[in-house]
Amino acid sequence: KRQWENDEWSERISFDDVLERVEPDGTAPFDIKYADMKLGNKCDLACLMCNPGDSSKWIPDYNKLMKSDIDQETKNILEWRKEEGRLNWYRHDSVFWKDIQSKLDTMESFYIIGGEPTINSEFESFLEMCVKSGHSGRINLRFNTNGLTTPERHLELYKRFKNVLIHLSIDGIGSYHDLIRYPSTWQEL
């Protein structure tokens, strides 16, 4: 995936193009073309490699672990900084959503991560906002998913985008998948 991203961005804008746009005062007026957005930690899996910051499904186990008899050094390593609103700030930030909406006419690409975007209501609202703006047909959409949920409404909305690239997270097959991507089963996937 990283090599694909490097190739993709190497063709966007050259260093010389950037220098040409820099004003004498050092400012460089650019339209925003790309955004990475993490829409919280809501997820339906508790994968081995995740933590509460990336998967809400991990929170009960994390809380139990932190109450158990483990040494302070291990607790410090495992500490999850759960400042109020840190993971779901976007839900209550109307300025953020208005700003995104105002930039849709110049946006070329969005990359969405979660949690699991397909079960996040803000992901669907974001898709609808892009479509309603009339600019979705020129926007490339990429997102990561565990592949367990594909709402019909999303499928209809995807058709309105220029391109939709779905990164399906699979870390093993059979019993390896079942262990790593708990509580999903390979058969279910």
Model-found features: residue ranges?
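Core AdoMet radical
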Residues: I32-K42, G53-S94, D105-S121, S133-P151, ...
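A conserved mid-protein helix/loop that constitutes part of the nucleotide-sugar donor-binding site
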Residues: E124
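Generic structural signal for well-ordered alpha-helices
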Residues: L127, L155-Y158
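Flexible, acidic/Gly-rich N-terminal and inter-domain linker regions that tether
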Residues: K1-K33, G53
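Conserved alpha-helix/loop element of class I SAM-dependent methyltransferases that forms part
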Residues: F96-I100
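Local cysteine-cluster metal-coordination motifs and their immediate loop/turn environment
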Residues: K1-R2, K42-P52
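A general structural signal for short secondary-structure junctions and capping/turn motifs
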Residues: T27-A28, Q101-K103
